[in-house]
């Protein structure tokens, strides 16, 4: 490299390559220290260090750097027209994932290490062999499935996540189904004189396509789509850092008997992990009365002692109208505010503030977005090293996918730290600290 002039752009490329190299060495080092090999794409075994809860921060950071730097390197050296057209063709990947998941191809390939021919898969799935072959060839080209020999496909490390027994497949079903359909109306909605300026949940791309709001849709399609949506929420928790909650905050500083109010907590699945780790904590789960049986079933199955000794309870709430249980030590709000526009979020937080005692804390557990300019770099925000985009670009892209999903589905959004601080201030709350979990974060407030 030293034989060539060190132009600014050459230095940019070299810096990206060095980031990739050093981060790959970090990945190798972590696995080596654990006495394990890095999993092959062809492997079907449960991977080591595959979940957020088991991934050391250094490995998580290295993975994000590699994803960010590889993507930035590719778009820097490729022809611009190629890049844009390939991005526009991204719908084909969603379409093929939809076919593979709905046809249960990964299920049929379970326990078939030598693979099955597309003719056999066609008989099992009911999809035409020629067309199925096109779909699987595309997915294998994208490293989903492995072509053992011409037209014979086997599962690999990625395709096993499409098995119907894996909740991630429910995520794929929702994303490539009703959300994919809603995305086709993005321009029609944003350019519509009535829908475009509105932030009402009744004026969304989702409603334009499906004739119902996001939540109405799942209420009226209970038999077909609600179970899949519920499974998708489990899958979402598995691939985000729900399991990291016990590690994300200084829970040990709470006094024995401290009470966490899980506002809008559904069945309390997130705070269940917390009580398992810190049995001196009590949890009050608050959500709609209709969710009480789900809370009872989950806790009775996973931690029955907590019900028997009163370390968990369920108190119904409409968080827009009702004040949560008063004088709790922590009010925990997970993936609730991203469903709602700012005014609605302020109302929820005002009700929470009304319930707080002077020592109480609010913990908002959400994605925290960053801008792509270094003007947004703050002490609180974990920013990527140069020459990467400060928000890690492709290394943290899923939170930006989610942001657009909330826009199209609910007229809402994921928020930056400043946006959280602003809605907190409108509710009378004071920002304390950002606790970064690697993917999501806890935004802490006092009253």
From Swiss-Prot:
pH dependence remark: Optimum pH is 8.0.
GO molecular function, one term: protein dimerization activity
Uppermost EC category: transferase
InterPro entries xref list: COMT-like, O_MeTrfase_dom, Plant_O-MeTrfase_dimerisation, SAM-dependent_MTases_sf, WH-like_DNA-bd_sf, WH_DNA-bd_sf
Active site: 338
Domain of life: Eukaryota
A Pfam match: Dimerisation
SUPFAM superfamilies documented for this protein: S-adenosyl-L-methionine-dependent methyltransferases (SSF53335), Winged helix' DNA-binding domain (SSF46785)
One GO process term, biological-process aspect: methylation
Keywords: Lignin degradation, Methyltransferase, S-adenosyl-L-methionine, Transferase
EC number: 2.1.1.-
Binding site for S-adenosyl-L-methionine: 264-265, 287, 318-319, 334
Function comment: S-adenosyl-L-methionine-dependent methyltransferase that preferentially catalyzes the methylation of 3-OH phenolic compounds like isovanillic acid and 3-OH-4-Met cinnamic acid. May play a role in promoting lignin degradation by methylating and inactivating free-hydroxyl phenolic compounds, products of lignin cleavage which are known inhibitors of lignin peroxidases.
Similarity field: Belongs to the class I-like SAM-binding methyltransferase superfamily. Cation-independent O-methyltransferase family. COMT subfamily.
Protein's name in the database: 3-O-methyltransferase 2
């Amino acid at each position: 490299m030293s034989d060539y002039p060190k132009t600014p752009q050459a230095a940019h490329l070299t810096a990206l390559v060095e980031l990739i190299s050093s981060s790959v060495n970090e990945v190798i080092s972590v696995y080596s220290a654990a006495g394990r090999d890095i999993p092959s794409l062809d492997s079907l075994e449960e991977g080591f260090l595959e979940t957020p809860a088991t991934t050391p921060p250094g490995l998580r950071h290295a993975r994000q750097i590699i994803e960010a730097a590889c993507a930035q390197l590719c778009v820097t050296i490729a022809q611009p027209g190629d890049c844009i057209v390939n991005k526009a063709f991204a719908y084909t990947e969603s379409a093929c994932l939809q076919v593979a998941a709905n046809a249960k191809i990964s299920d049929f390939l379970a326990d078939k290490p030598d693979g099955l021919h597309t003719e056999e898969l066609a008989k099992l799935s009911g999809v035409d062999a020629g067309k199925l072959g096109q779909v699987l060839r595309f997915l294998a080209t994208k490293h989903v499935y492995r072509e053992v020999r011409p037209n014979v496909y086997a599962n690999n490390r990625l395709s096993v996540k499409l098995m119907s027994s894996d909740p991630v497949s429910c995520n794929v079903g929702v994303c490539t189904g009703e959300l994919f359909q809603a995305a086709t109306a993005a321009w029609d909605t944003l350019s519509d004189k009535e829908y475009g300026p509105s932030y009402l949940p009744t004026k969304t791309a989702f409603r334009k396509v499906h004739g119902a709001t996001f939540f109405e849709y799942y209420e009226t399609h209970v038999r077909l789509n609600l179970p899949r949506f519920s499974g998708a929420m489990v899958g979402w928790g598995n691939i985000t850092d729900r399991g990291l909650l016990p590690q994300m905050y200084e829970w040990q500083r709470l006094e024995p008997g401290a009470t966490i109010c899980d506002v809008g907590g559904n069945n309390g699945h997130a705070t269940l992990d917390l009580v398992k780790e810190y049995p001196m904590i009590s949890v009050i789960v608050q959500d709609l009365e209709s969710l009480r049986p789900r809370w009872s079933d989950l806790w009775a199955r996973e931690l029955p002692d907590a019900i028997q000794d009163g370390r968990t309870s369920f108190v119904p709430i409409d968080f827009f109208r009702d004040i949560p249980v008063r004088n709790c030590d922590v009010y925990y709000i997970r993936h609730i505010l991203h469903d709602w526009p700012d005014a609605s979020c302020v109302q929820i937080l005002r009700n929470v503030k009304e319930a707080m005692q002077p020592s109480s804390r609010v913990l908002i557990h959400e994605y925290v977005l960053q801008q792509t300019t270094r003007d947004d770099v703050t002490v609180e925000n974990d920013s990527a090293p140069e020459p990467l985009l400060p928000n890690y670009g492709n290394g943290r892209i899923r939170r930006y996918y989610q942001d657009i999903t909330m826009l199209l589905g609910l007229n809402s959004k994921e928020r930056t730290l400043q946006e959280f601080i602003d809605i907190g201030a409108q509710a009378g709350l004071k920002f304390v600290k950002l606790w970064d979990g690697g993917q999501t974060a806890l935004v802490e407030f006092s009253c």
